[in-house]
Amino acid sequence: MPAVNQIELHPYFQQKELVALHKEHGITTQAWSPIGGITSYRDSAKRSFDDPVILAIGEKYGTSAAQVMLRWHIQNGVQVIPKSTKAERITENFDVFDFELTAEEIAQIDALDTGVRGGPEPEVITLEAFGRDIPEA
């Protein structure tokens, strides 16, 4: 039984059944692509960064869309590993503990779930497809 399962998880792809299974078995859920940057890769017309619901919540608290999404994860008990190469965004990603989303705001974000993965399907993530040999540690 794993202690942690790292999965694609963001407002547009919430994997609620899997997260519930993790909780049932004491497995920590860790979200990669927690702010939905991956949502722009599948020719989607919608991007979580531009979602009006998320932007409106951010405006209320004076925060970015990314901060709203990170806070949503934290309040749902999910570990997050956001990616950024920009120092100001890395700092911003840590600045999510001075506000709290209401139950209504969490429900609004929960309602954004499309069930559509942004990243590749797990079965296509193979050595042949990605061409990287990862040696034993």
Regions found by a protein language model. Name each.
Residues 1-137:
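Beta/alpha (TIM)-barrel catalytic core signal, keyed to glycine-rich beta->alpha loops juxtaposed to Asp/Glu
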